[in-house]
A protein has these predicted regions:
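Cofactor-binding beta-sheet edge motifs in enzyme active sites
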Residues: 1-752
């Protein structure tokens, strides 16, 4: 993938072409008619590439994002439907096919700051060109609502409405400005005429969509900002929803795999004789190692793989257990997690080629003049995604083509990755995307899709490949382990005069280690310390690590200053009104300052991520060293909550996911391989351990933020700070399960 510069973007020649996510319909050539055959049935008319109308006046929104429980497809349909003035009872949605015309612009959106703001609502051609070139149809980064929705679906809905008005005006021979719309109806009061949208859909579809349709103001919204039933819930409740593992193809066989346990390993010796004797086993095949398999993370050290194909999953699993394989690990089978963190420590201390995220003021002078200097070091482990539905895909390769059934976060990217692995043109791969039983970033990487396609090509039969839970835990693209070192100066007035932070390694997003607090001198930076552990996006990416680090350290500074943690933060946020409002709200709703019984504690944390501000207060009870999370209170400012109930659900989901990680989550490396294998040693939060969660939404009117990830980063530091409040023990590394909290230990080997 070549590097896109601002000049390259501008010289694509399509910047001034039209409305953002109306897609190719706004570029020269108007390709809506060409796409109609791809996404429309006989009784449907594609008005523009994102919405179609049928003869019963039902509007179907075509959504270019995958559904993995986050409810984005419903919320995106809300945004289009509101601008279209559609009757919500006559709105449904379907996922866009994985073709370049429905690419999205997740990565391209990062250059918005370099594009004149006047073009932001109308630079579809720019982003579409970038998205197509990169093979992007990504669901991630909490961008579905704040980008596709805000700059795409709203404009598409408004454009469709204007096109339908224009079509009615031409037919009725009346001025367009005299026509009103309401609940999927066109109304001309002067002539007492009324007609459903469907009546003019065919005429509207022949028009060029307007490049800058008029959008509603917030006080005009009828669907945006209101709770509506999620359209995917009923089928998930009654069991009719289709996930990738539900797929059945005539003649289908099953496969399971084992990749080299030590990353980058290759097969040295293979004995499949016992496996082939098991009833139902059809074949045992091998798949090559690879250094590039697509997805956000690319691929690092992907070893060779053994696959057993059988008439059912169970005989495939039995066959895999019977395979005897010796691996060539190329000397990588002697290192451990302890060695990795020791390497991190050496590299931070050496500081070679340190890069700055933020450098301001004079940190050295602040340290020299400090009344008190506070230092601390934190670390977090590698984490697996632990999706409830393990990785799986069904593939059929025949006659120079491939058909694949899968649940993934980047259908277009997966299609291209599978094509490349098979040596096909992308047009020869048909991909059907299904609901996912969890994604969290793991299903943005295409390794499991490629495996299914390669096995199917080898056996020349449809193959459903299913990873075991053990494979799912041990062959993940993990959230990176990080070590982070801090030093701060407190002056004679009790103010934080400087903030220093060095960590390993830099990932995404760039702003994750930055702080919102008013500290004059700051030196925040990182050093490279690469390992051979595959890494990838994990719910809220680097915000989870750095949120824990920075919000724990600011709490330590409050304690060193003898200050209340909430009031200390509030003083440092005096010039950040949105941050302060969220902090004040969570403190108020949590009853901050109210006394707690001995053994109980309360902690607070604040993190801005993906355009959304979240503050959380955690209340815990510590009994005989065991921590019970009793209550979590969250305040969230997303600018505008498109679906308030959906937003709350995502914040609560993020809290539970983050609590699992903070309390139990840990992937450790032993002899070069992952030691954990299943939920007995990679524990997740269970229902009896789940706290009461209260979520309070602030619609500040700021830019629309994300929802799927911002609930996660603040929970770990709030929990750690609550434990300190209850016990006096400062938690500086996770997970919490590794601590013995029966004693008030401020410093120990575990806490260092």
């Amino acid at each position: 993938m070549g590097k896109w510069t601002r000049r390259a973007f501008i010289t694509t020649g399509v910047v001034a072409g039209g409305g953002f996510a109306l897609g190719v319909a706004l570029r020269p050539g108007h390709r809506t008619p060409e796409l109609a055959s791809l996404v429309s049935k006989d009784d449907e008319t594609l008005v523009n590439v994102w919405v179609k109308l049928d003869q019963d006046n039902v509007a179907t929104v075509i959504v270019p994002h995958s559904e993995m429980g986050q409810g984005a497809q419903t919320a995106l349909a809300q945004m289009l439907a509101d601008e279209m003035d559609a009757d919500w009872d006559l709105v449904q949605f379907e996922e866009a096919p994985p073709v370049s015309e429905y690419a999205n612009y997740l990565l391209g959106y990062g250059i918005v700051g370099e594009v004149p703001k006047v073009l932001v609502p109308t630079f579809d051609g720019l982003m579409l060109t970038v998205a197509q070139s990169m093979g992007m149809q990504i669901t991630g980064g909490s961008l579905s609502i704040r980008s596709t929705g805000q700059y795409g679906m709203r404009i598409a809905g408004a454009a469709a409405r204007e096109m339908l008005i224009e079509a009615a005006a031409e037919t009725w021979q009346v001025p367009a400005e005299e026509i009103q719309t309401k609940a999927s109806q066109l109304i001309h009061s002067a002539s007492n005429r009324r007609a459903p949208y469907a009546e003019f859909a065919a005429v509207a579809a022949q028009m060029m969509p307007p490049s800058s349709p008029k959008l509603k103001s917030a006080d005009e919204f009828k669907i945006i900002g209101h709770d509506v039933p999620r359209r995917d819930i009923p089928s998930k409740v009654d069991g009719s929803a289709q996930f990738a593992m539900d797929v059945q193809v005539p003649g289908m066989v099953y496969a399971t795999v084992q990749r080299a346990p030590v990353f980058g390993g290759e097969i040295a010796k293979l004995d499949v004789s016992a496996a082939k004797k098991i009833t139902g086993v059809i074949d045992v095949v091998t798949l090559p190692s690879s250094k590039k398999e697509g997805g956000f993370s690319g691929a690092q050290n992907i070893g060779e793989t053994v696959a057993v194909v059988a008439e059912g999953y169970w005989p495939a699993k039995q066959g895999m257990d019977a395979v005897l394989v010796e691996w060539n690990n190329f000397g990588q089978d002697s290192f451990s997690s302890d060695e990795i963190f020791a390497q991190f420590d050496r590299d931070i201390t050496a500081g070679l080629d340190r890069e700055n995220d933020r450098l301001q003021g004079d940190v050295g002078a602040a340290i020299e003049n400090a009344t008190k200097v506070v230092e601390a070091e934190y670390r977090v482990p590698y984490l697996a995604h632990a999706c409830m539905e393990p990785m799986n895909a069904t593939a059929h390769v025949h006659d120079g083509e491939c058909e694949i059934w899968i649940g993934c976060q980047n259908p277009l990217g997966f299609r291209e990755a599978v094509a490349a692995a098979l040596g096909f043109e992308p047009e020869k791969v048909t991909l059907h995307n299904y609901f996912m039983g969890g994604g969290f970033g793991r299903r943005a990487t295409s390794d499991y899709a490629i495996q299914a396609a390669l096995v199917a090509a080898k056996v020349q039969r449809p193959v459903q490949l299913i990873w075991s839970r053990e494979e799912d835990i041990r062959q993940d693209y993990y959230r990176p382990a990080v070590r982070s070192r801090f030093r701060a100066a407190i002056d004679a007035n009790g103010d934080v005069a400087s903030w220093e932070n060095t960590y390993v390694d830099k990932h995404e997003p760039a702003e994750a280690p930055l702080i919102p607090y008013a500290v004059g001198s700051q030196d925040i930076g990182y050093v490279a310390s690469p390992t051979n552990i595959p890494f990838g996006p994990w719910r809220s990416v680097d915000h989870t690590q750095h949120g824990f680090f920075t919000e724990s350290f600011i709490d330590e500074l409050a304690a060193a200053n003898g200050a209340d943690p909430y009031e200390f933060r509030a003083q440092l946020l005096r010039d950040k009104p949105r941050h302060l409002a969220v902090l004040n709200k969570v403190a108020e709703e949590a009853g901050w300052g109210r006394s707690l019984a001995p053994g109980r504690g309360r902690g607070i944390a604040l993190q801005e991520s993906f355009g959304t501000l979240v503050a959380e207060v955690v209340e815990v009870t510590v009994t005989d060293g065991d921590v019970k999370v009793d209550r979590v209170v969250a305040a969230v400012d997303p600018g505008l909550a498109i679906s308030p109930d959906g937003l709350k659900a995502q914040i609560e989901s993020g809290i539970i996911y983050g609590l699992s990680a903070a309390m139990f989550g840990e992937v450790t490396i032993k002899n070069g391989a992952v030691a954990q294998s299943n939920f007995h040693d990679y524990q997740i939060l269970r229902m009896p351990d789940a706290p009461v969660i209260e979520t309070h939404v602030i619609n500040s009117g700021g830019p629309v933020g994300g929802a799927g990830e911002p609930g996660t980063p603040a929970i770990a530091p709030a929990l750690a700070n609550a434990v300190f409040d209850a016990t006096g023990s400062r938690v500086r590394q996770l997970p919490l399960k590794n601590y013995d909290l029966k004693f008030r230990i401020e410093e120990s080997d575990e806490v260092a």
